[in-house]
C-alpha cells in the first residue's frame, strides 16, 4: 500500500490538475458562445449568395461554366480543417482518419491527389507520412476572419479553374450542439448542383435582366461563393472545436474529482490502519511491561 505522504501528494497534484481543466472548460464555454454566434450570423450571407448563383446559373445561358460542369477526374483536392492544438477529444482524429482512409482507398499515387490543411494537427499527420500537402495554414484565431484563409480559398478556386484539380472536397466537424458534432464531407468543386438545376425544365424562377452578362457575373460570383463555403465551414468547425474541448475538459474535471474521492478513501484507510497499528503496538508494549 502506498504511504500516506505519497497518497497526499497525488491528491494535491490531482486537485491542481482539476483546477486547470475546470478553468479550460470555462474558457472554452465562453469561446463556444461567440463561435456559435459567428457561425449563425454568417449563414444568411451564404444562403443569399447561393440564391443569386442559382438564379444566374439556371437561366440556361450560362450553366456550362467550367466551375459548374463535371469533367474526367485525374486529380482530387482535399481541404482538411483541424485545430492547432489538442485536448479536444476526437475532434482532430476523426477528420484525419476519414481523409487518410479515403486517400488510401481511392488513390494509388501521390500525383492523383493534393491535401490542403488548415490547422497544425492535419499538417503534422500527413507530412509525417510523406503525403502530398501542397498548401497549409496555421495560427487560425479562435474567432476567424476571412483574411486568415483568403489565400488558401482563392488558390483552391484558381487551381481548379487552371485544371490542377478536377474535383475538390472539404472535410470538417459540423457543430450540432455543445455535446455533439458530426463529420462532414462536402464537394466544393465542381458545383454540379447548379448545373443540374439549370437543366430542369420545371424550374420556377423570377425573370431577371442581367447587366453585364450572366457569364461575366458568374465569373465573379462563383469563386466568391466557393470561398464563402470554405469560410463558413471554418466557422462551423471552430464552434465544433470549442464544444469538443469544453466537453473533454469537463470529462477530465469529472475524472479528476472521482480520482480525488478514491485517493481520499485510500488515504483515510491508510491513516486508519496506521493508527490501529500504533494502538496495537502501544497495547502490546504495555502488556509486555506487566
From Swiss-Prot:
Membrane topology listed for this record: Peripheral membrane protein
Q: Which residues cross the membrane?
A: none
Q: Which GO terms describe its molecular function?
A: ATP binding; proton-transporting ATP synthase activity, rotational mechanism
* GO terms of biological process kind: proton motive force-driven plasma membrane ATP synthesis
| Disulfide bridge partners, by residue number | none
The signal peptide, as residue positions, is none
**Which InterPro entries does the record cross-reference, listed alphabetically?**
ATP_synth_F1_ATPase_gsu, ATP_synth_F1_gsu, ATP_synth_F1_gsu_CS
Query: What Pfam families does the record tag this protein with?
Result: ATP-synt (PF00231)
Q: GO CC terms on record?
A: plasma membrane; proton-transporting ATP synthase complex
Query: SUPFAM superfamilies from the xrefs?
Result: ATP synthase (F1-ATPase), gamma subunit
Query: Which HAMAP family does the record cross-reference, listed alphabetically?
Result: ATP_synth_gamma_bact
| Main function | Produces ATP from ADP in the presence of a proton gradient across the membrane. The gamma chain is believed to be important in regulating ATPase activity and the flow of protons through the CF(0) complex.
Please state which protein family the record places this protein in. Belongs to the ATPase gamma chain family.
NCBIfam families linked to this entry: ATPsyn_F1gamma, PRK05621.2-1
Q: How is the subunit organization of this protein annotated in UniProt?
A: F-type ATPases have 2 components, CF(1) - the catalytic core - and CF(0) - the membrane proton channel. CF(1) has five subunits: alpha(3), beta(3), gamma(1), delta(1), epsilon(1). CF(0) has three main subunits: a, b and c.
Mind telling me what this protein is named? ATP synthase gamma chain
Q: Report the source organism.
A: Listeria welshimeri serovar 6b (strain ATCC 35897 / DSM 20650 / CCUG 15529 / CIP 8149 / NCTC 11857 / SLCC 5334 / V8)
Amino acid at each position: 500500500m502506498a504511504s500516506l505522504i505519497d497518497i497526499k501528494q497525488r491528491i494535491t497534484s490531482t486537485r491542481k490538475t482539476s483546477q486547470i481543466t475546470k478553468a479550460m472548460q470555462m474558457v472554452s464555454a465562453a469561446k463556444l458562445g461567440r463561435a456559435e454566434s459567428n457561425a449563425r450570423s454568417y449563414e444568411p450571407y451564404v444562403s443569399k449568395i447561393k440564391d443569386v448563383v442559382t438564379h444566374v446559373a439556371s437561366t440556361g445561358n450560362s450553366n456550362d461554366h467550367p466551375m459548374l460542369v463535371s469533367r474526367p477526374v485525374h486529380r482530387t483536392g482535399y481541404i482538411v480543417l483541424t485545430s492547432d492544438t489538442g485536448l479536444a477529444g476526437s475532434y482532430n482524429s476523426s477528420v484525419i482518419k476519414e481523409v487518410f482512409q479515403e486517400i488510401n482507398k481511392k488513390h494509388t499515387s501521390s500525383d492523383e491527389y493534393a491535401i490542403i490543411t488548415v490547422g497544425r494537427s492535419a499538417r503534422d499527420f500527413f507530412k509525417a507520412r510523406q503525403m502530398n500537402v501542397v498548401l497549409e495554414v496555421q495560427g487560425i484565431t479562435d474567432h476567424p476572419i476571412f483574411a486568415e484563409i483568403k489565400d488558401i480559398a482563392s488558390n483552391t478556386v484558381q487551381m481548379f479553374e487552371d485544371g490542377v484539380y478536377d474535383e475538390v472536397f472539404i472535410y470538417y466537424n459540423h457543430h450540432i450542439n455543445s455535446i455533439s458534432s458530426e463529420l462532414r464531407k462536402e464537394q466544393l468543386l465542381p458545383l454540379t448542383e447548379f448545373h443540374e438545376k439549370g437543366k430542369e425544365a420545371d424550374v420556377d424562377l423570377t425573370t431577371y435582366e442581367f447587366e453585364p452578362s450572366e457569364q461575366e457575373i458568374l465569373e465573379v460570383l462563383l469563386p466568391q461563393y466557393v470561398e464563402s463555403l470554405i469560410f463558413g465551414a471554418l466557422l462551423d468547425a471552430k464552434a465544433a472545436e470549442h464544444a469538443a474541448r469544453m466537453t473533454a475538459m469537463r470529462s477530465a474535471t469529472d475524472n479528476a474529482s472521482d480520482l480525488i474521492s478514491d485517493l481520499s478513501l485510500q488515504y483515510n484507510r491508510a491513516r486508519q490502519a496506521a493508527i490501529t497499528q500504533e494502538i496495537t503496538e502501544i497495547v502490546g508494549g504495555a502488556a509486555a511491561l506487566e
